Amino acid sequence: FRTDGQELEIRQHDPYNRGLLWPQRFAVTLCGERDSVIRVNMTDTLFRMQLPFVPSRVLPNTDGRGYGVFVPDEPALHWLAAHWWEIEDDTARQSLLMVLYENYLAKHISADDWVNSLITGLPAEKNALVASTASGYLANVMREIAPANRAEVEARIYTMTQNHPLPSCRIQLMRLFMQNAISEPMVKKLYILWQQQSDKHLNRQDYTTLAYELAIRMPLESEQI
């Protein structure tokens, strides 16, 4: 995606250079003095369109109907990573979260920037489907973050397991937390949780899984566990 004044340019590229084309229709949101949605009918590798105004950013595939990796221009990508949770429409927010994930996989977003985007936006998410999607993405990126940032990330995830407004999200976050927490303070919290079995949302299998995880992380207490 590229804009030049009031002109929008979209290019489609086959990453394997097979000359394939994917005709498709999808919505694009133009942000600026007044947000506007346009419909794109992509029938060739290049699409150009005159816009009604000069947008501050262009957000691709906001209706979720398109397929493939949508790569916004750099300013739009940075804005999305810092503000995706502010998008009011649930469908657009879910679709653009997927756009961010695909750009993370394509190495356009670093693991640390991606995890920071997720743990910043997730506490505000009220839609169960979007929250579940964000939590799943968080589980995928946990092992990739820099060791120096690990303890802080784990602490912020633990906070969400205690106070996120959606019970389903709290459970999902707790399960990923049990599988991924390695910092000493957070492992101690998991040990206390296993001892007291105080989280009534977790079932017997969850606590059995937690026992196995703790036995690996706390080898000196493994026999007791």
Predicted features and spans:
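Non-catalytic accessory/interaction domains
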Residues: F1-I225
